[in-house]
A protein has these predicted regions:
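ATP/NTP phosphate-donor binding region
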Residues: 1-64, 71, 115
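Short N-terminal binding/cap micro-motifs at the start of the first secondary-structure element
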Residues: 13-17, 219, 310
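Short amphipathic alpha-helical segments
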Residues: 18-20, 74-77, 106-108, 223-224
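Catalytic core of DAGKc-family lipid kinases
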Residues: 31, 55, 78-208
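Short glycine/serine/threonine-rich phosphate/pyrophosphate-binding segments
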Residues: 46, 68-73, 103, 129
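Glycine-rich phosphate/pyrophosphate-binding beta-alpha loops
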Residues: 153, 157, 211-225, 292-293
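ATP/nucleoside-binding phosphotransfer catalytic cores, i.e., glycine-rich phosphate-binding loops
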Residues: 197-199, 204, 223-224, 229-230, ...
Length: 312
């Protein structure tokens, strides 16, 4: 196997990579050198492909696609590291954005043009970034676990992702998520949950959304955690509390600017481990994990400091 592996989602951004591959391939090979190119065929493929690449001895694994593809690839790498005797990541992670949302590109300060992003990967020295592990309940009711590199949340955000992923993304990232958020606002009922941050006493709160943030943006440009940094060794925990419909609609004009703190029912805290469960065990509170909806509460979010080496 080549020491560098490129995992491409050919369907990202309306099939951009697939349509432009004859032009993109020589440019990418020129920038990245000898590289093993692999194409995903369906959602979720990036995780086992990245895991296999790390286990086969790759030095660099690059995700090319949207935020979901990047999260899949990072998750596969983290799974490989977890199954290894090594205490540090053995392989670097790179990202070439072809995104609907583009949140991860903002957080990692990745150039928006593919040629520039590839050049950055080729020149940059790896730097450690944090990740998160999540243990939760899958849609089939069975315990599951996974990883995230940006934001994992619960509440209306899970419904928004469900609406985004079942519909068309032809409007582009920000508009797609904004329309889905409006639709969800009129359908969602605030959930009563119990929250524990690290070893602090648990508390109950009715939530519109509760976000455990490693990065600062989610939902196609929503600035959910303005103080969050992907390499600071701690989660930012943002609670959008028991918002009324009017407050929820007002939130839409604030959150893209990171000004949701102007609402009295919004709070922000710090933690390295977060446990959230529904007060009513029969209530299904959906999760949003890096833009996907893998399941529901209860969930435990655990920080993995410096778990990935990022090049770009």
């Amino acid at each position: 196997m080549a020491k560098s592996v490129l995992i491409v989602n050919p369907q990202a951004r309306g099939g951009f990579a697939q349509k432009k591959w004859p032009v993109l391939e020589p440019m990418l090979r020129d920038a990245l050198g000898v590289i093993d190119v692999q194409f995903t065929k369906r959602a979720g493929d990036g995780t086992p492909m990245a895991k296999a690449a790390v286990e086969a001895g790759a030095d660099l694994v690059v995700a090319m696609g949207g935020d979901g593809t990047a999260s899949e690839v990072a998750s596969g790498m983290l799974a490989a590291f977890a199954g290894s005797a090594r205490s540090e990541p053995s392989c670097a992670f790179g990202y070439l954005p072809c995104a609907t949302g583009g949140d991860l590109r903002r957080i990692l300060h990745t150039p928006s043009e593919l040629a520039d992003a590839a050049a950055a990967i080729a020149k940059a020295k790896p730097r450690p970034i944090d990740a998160g592990r999540i243990d939760y309940i899958g849609h089939d009711g069975k315990p599951c676990s996974g990883y995230f590199i940006n934001v994992a949340s619960c509440g209306i955000s899970g419904l928004v992702d469900h609406l985004v992923n079942e519909g068309s993304k032809a409007l582009g990232g920000k508009a797609t998520f904004f329309v889905a958020s409006l639709r969800a606002t009129f359908r969602y009922k605030n959930a009563l949950v119990k929250v524990r941050l690290d070893d602090q006493p648990a508390y109950e709160e009715r939530i519109y959304t509760l976000a455990v943030s490693n990065g600062a943006y989610f939902g196609g440009g929503m600035h959910i955690a303005p103080e969050a940094k992907i390499d600071d060794g701690i989660f930012d925990v943002t609670t959008l509390g028991d918002l009324s419909l009017v407050e929820a609609l007002r939130l839409g004009g604030l959150i893209y600017k990171g000004e949701q703190g102007r609402l009295s029912k919004v709070s922000s805290k710090k933690a390295r481990r977060v446990v959230i469960e529904p007060v009513n065990p029969d209530e299904k509170v959906l999760l949003d994990v890096d833009g996907e909806t893998p399941g529901r509460l209860p969930a435990t979010f655990t920080l993995l400091p410096g778990a990935l080496l990022y090049r770009g």
